[in-house]
Each structure stands twice: as C-alpha cells, then as structure tokens.
Amino acid sequence: MSKTLSVDKSQLRSPWSTYWTLTKPKVVALMLLTSVVGMSLAPHEHFTWHQALIALVGIALMAGSAAAFNHLIDRRIDAKMARTYRRPLPKGDVSPFNVLLFALLIGSLGFLSLMLWVNSLTAYLTFASLLGYAAVYTLYLKRATPQNIVIAGIAGAMPPLLGWTSITGELHPHAWVLVMIIFIWTPPHFWALAIHRKEDYAKVNIPMLPVTHGVEYTKTSILLYAILLALVCMLPVLVGMASYLYLFSALVLNVCFVRYAIKLKFRAEERTAIEMFRFSIYFLLLLFCALLLDQQLAL
C-alpha cells in the first residue's frame, strides 16, 4: 500500500518547473536588479518604460540561456558533486537535446528582442556576456586555470553596463564603475564557496583556487579582495554617482564583508566559508538596492 502511495517527486514536477530551474532564476533576478540600477543611473533623455521593459526581458532571456548552456556543459561533473547532483540533467528530468533547444530558443528570442526593440550595442554586449560565461568560462577556463573566476568574472559583471546601454545606446565610464564593483566582488564570493566545497571540486578535477593553491592561500586572497572591494565601492561617491545614503550603506556592508574575511582567515569555524558565501549574495543585493534608492531620493 505504501509503495502504491509513494510517488517520486520528480515525476510530479512539471516540465515548466524543470526548464525554469535550468535558467537559474535567483541568479538572473540579481542580474536584473543590477541592470535596473544601470538603467536608473543612466541619462534619461531617451528613456521609455516600454524600451526598459523589453531590455530587461531580453537580458533575462539571454542570461537564462547562458545558465541552461552551463547546465548542459557541466552535466557530467554536476552528477558527481554533492551541491549539484540534484539538478535536472543529472536527475534525468530532461534530455540534453531538449536543454540545447531550450537554450538556443530563449537565447535567440532575447537577442532578437534587444536587437529589434532596444539597440544593437546592448544586443551584442549581452551576446558577448553569454559567450563569455557559457563558452569561454564553462567550456574552457573553469577546467583550465585556478584564475577561472577572476578572468571570466567580467561576463557576470556586465548587467549594469547592459542596463545603461539599453537606455543610452552608448558606453560611459560611470557604467564601468558598476561593472568593476561586481568584477571585484566575484572572486571572494566564489572562493568562499570553493573552500566549503573543496573536496567536491577536487573529485571532478576542477582547478579551483583551494584545490590548486590550498585553503590558506585562498583565505588570504579573499581577504585582499575584500579590502579592494571596500575601496572600489567608494567610487560611485567619488565620481558623483551617489551620495550619503549609499555611502553609509556601502561602509556598513563592507565592514561586515571584511570582518567575515578576517574571521575566515584567522578564526574560521567549520561553516564560516559557506556563511561568507551566503552573506556575499545579500551584500551585492543590498549594495545595489542602496545605490538605486540613493539615486531615486536624489531626483
């Protein structure tokens, strides 16, 4: 009787839910927030809500496509890692061919949306970001060098620039300031996770920094990047993009981030690395929310 009533949850899962998971929606949501900040800080001479909405949809579709390609390319190593073995492809919830079609479909829709209704610069920059993450990072850098996250970090740091160009159609140094914040944030964010999952990465021969250079070296690198990040986060104030609300928020958040890095380096407990990884997500979320609110209050 119990066997009859027992149903595998994967059998109850809808195909739409599976494809939704492939897009890494939480990651995409954070990317869209940083895109909105880029839009908000850009000059608004040619701003329309219609264009902004299409831009966000196009960026989201192409980011989801990059995530799906990542699932497809990494499916074999995902099946061997404790953090990822429950993903749709290792579980057999969807076929690799269907994931390929899905990634191509939403990526194409996103690119066409940006090209036809936003501007070509944003379309090509978003496509370059997709290639940087799905091909350059996932196919090559991830397996080739412990500096994989550092080199490929530019791809994940692009959304604020994409938001900016979707409104203005041109590049601007202020947009690159936002890119720089995410670029410097990326290594300590992922290295904290890599420390926590060191054995997993070693098992599948992924040369993350803790695997190739040791945990202590990685902790030192995280601390140095945390200090550098605190300095870079002051740039929006120094160049006139933000004022006191952002300054106060950035100071508080960076003090907390550096304290986590110091604790990880000198007084680490078993869960310190994963706690820092989780805090780093809230750090970026709150930092960009503060920047957005600061800008809105200044209007």
Swiss-Prot record:
CDD domains in UniProt: PT_UbiA_Cox10
Coiled coil: none
Single GO MF descriptor: protoheme IX farnesyltransferase activity
Transmembrane regions listed in the UniProt entry: 27-47, 53-73, 97-117, 121-141, 149-169, 175-195, 222-242, 244-264, 273-293
Record-listed E.C. numbers: 2.5.1.141
GO CC annotation: plasma membrane
InterPro entries (UniProt xref): Protohaem_IX_farnesylTrfase, UbiA_prenyltransferase, UbiA_prenylTrfase_CS, UbiA_sf
Name of the protein this chain belongs to: Protoheme IX farnesyltransferase
Organism name: Vibrio vulnificus (strain CMCP6)
Gene behind the chain: cyoE
